[in-house]
């Protein structure tokens, strides 16, 4: 049974389902959960005459996005009485899947749990998939928890 479970979070509905599944497994096995949110610092064009505040603002926004997600994960872990930790990780241009895999290895995780959406066709091709990249390169078991987009929302896009 899995005792050290690592879950990647991004604030999406599928990530919440993945968190719930990781907690369920940890509760059944007497294990613990490590939750991680990767903060991506995307390159931005900067007006040299204006200085660099826009870039810093983008970094602050990226870090701020992680806070409610990790706070939610911490509260769910506490509510379910499952031991765990939450972490924000900086990617700084590195592939998100690589950051997650490295951190899971550092945590000596038995299992990586990730959410994945039910995107198809061009949307999936354009957006890519961190979960798929991680699955292809992982050196330990990976559980993908799928969240299908509602049909009406998918058609509207």
Question: Where are the predicted features?
Answer:
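Short, well-ordered secondary-structure micro-motifs
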Residues: 18, 45-48, 96-99, 124-125, ...
